[in-house]
Amino acid sequence: MTENNNKEFTEGNILWKNVATASSFNKKEQQVFNVNKNEILIAKIGDEFKAMQSRCPHAGLSMLGSQMNSEKDLIFCKWHNTSFCYKDGKVDKWVDVPPYQKKLVKFFALFSKKLKQMVEMPETPIDIFRTQVIEENVWVGIEVAN
């Protein structure tokens, strides 16, 4: 373990960054932090902290404030009815919208290259990051090249 200061340390190929006090999550259960060019959403779920990429891969919109289901370990993107497992990042449901909405979007995609890419985008999991609490501080771990 290599300690740089009280804000970060390395452990193998993991760079650990101190992002917040655990008590700060009592008022705001979800918070977003920029860690080594990664925008990370950390959510307090019970007594645990889960960290994941903060933006849905479908359209790049923020998942801050999205509903969490602790029984199924899911976060639900509030924009396109997509859900992900917050433990492993796998897709649970991908753009689960009614058929008429899909047809409407496909029609408009004929006129927009960007919209066409979003409509045709394959299921994409979210990145998951490690967390730990040390002396009442929440730390997030990022893999770095050796």
Where are these regions (language model features)?
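Short metal-binding segments enriched for Cys and/or His
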Residues: S83-K93
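Glycine-rich His-Gly loop
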Residues: S54, H80-N81
